[in-house]
Amino acid sequence: DFDASVDESFLPEIIRLCKENGIRLILVHERTLLFPSAAAEPKALQAYKRVLAEYLQANNIALLDFSYDPRLPEEYFTDVLHMNAAGKAAFTQLLAEALKPLMQSGQ
């Protein structure tokens, strides 16, 4: 439950410090194969991620979500959590492409 745990986490403090120091905070969900699709993800995790996204949006924090990105297929992983060299290269390119407009616009 995100709401029950957020105040016990460092996230509010990280956001506060970033805002105070003019730092643009961007959070990223990487793809894993642990839950290969949204349908495979437990309902509690889906709810947690949804409330987290709402919290970040309310605090003007960008969230880049690659959780189920089809451009990162199973062949790019050495196991359910870790990408192989090809996966790392592909993810780096995707991340750079996603970050570029955020950095240019200052959103």
Spans of features found by a protein language model:
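Histidine-centered active-site loop/cap adjacent to the catalytic His
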Residues: 79-107
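Conserved, well-ordered alpha-helix/loop/beta-strand core segments that scaffold catalytic motifs
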Residues: 1-68
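Short coil/turn segments at secondary-structure junctions
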Residues: 2, 78-79
